[in-house]
Amino acid sequence: MDEKAAYFEHFPSLAGRTNRISYMDHTDHNPVKEHLMNEMMRTDLDLAILHHHGYFDTEYLNGTAPIRTVREAKEFIIRNVRMHVEEARERGRNYDSLRVVLEKRFDLPSTWLDDNPLADSLRIADSTLVANEDLHLEDFKIFGYRPNVPVVVIDACFCGSFHQDDCIANEYIFQPGSTVAVIANTVNALQDKWHDRFIGLTAQGGCVGDVVRFSNLLESHVIGDPTFRFAPVPGSVDVDGLLLQNKVSSWKKLLKSPLPDVQSLAIEQLR
């Protein structure tokens, strides 16, 4: 995985150490929500980077599960017809006349709609299925979701919309778990932006705020404590000390640093 190779450059101390970087593909499970929550509640993770689409109240995790059998195809069609029926009901349409229209439009056998699509049991089942595809604000309470990863990067639109009454990033911070800082986007985020730029500084004595400060992405913000830092790895360069002194001579020496993040920071400070 290319991204994993990049993280070994950000955090070279992890090279040769097994099981230090884990990866979850959203297509591994459908729905993946509970698997993701279980991973995020582990107490042995330091950093999580989440790639998905988002809104201020939602992490979009899954779409419709791939259809592999004829039965699944039939269930998918009937479920979508029920959605049409529900939307029409809200507009005051008559079900019997609508049924005739839908059977003709989608070339459906009349027996497929024998069950009452407006039955509460079916509506609840459909709503539950859709809700489980994504992670919502209320899921933190419903599932007792308490993230324990100290630093979380949410590479998605809107999840850091702090101007709303609540947002996904807020919930990561204010749960009883151990998450201290979340880097998230207030508005739309470019899909090709450099989401992990300078993330390696967190292993060199840099604080989370440094990552956002030097990334220059207008939509990204730290929700939580921007001064949070990890204990630096042995032989680190003490990023915060260098920034405090801000000596040109020191930055020039670091232009030859074997650490890409430190070398990039030196270029940033000298330009």
Predicted regions span which residues?
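Cysteine-dependent hydrolase recognition
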Residues: 1-271
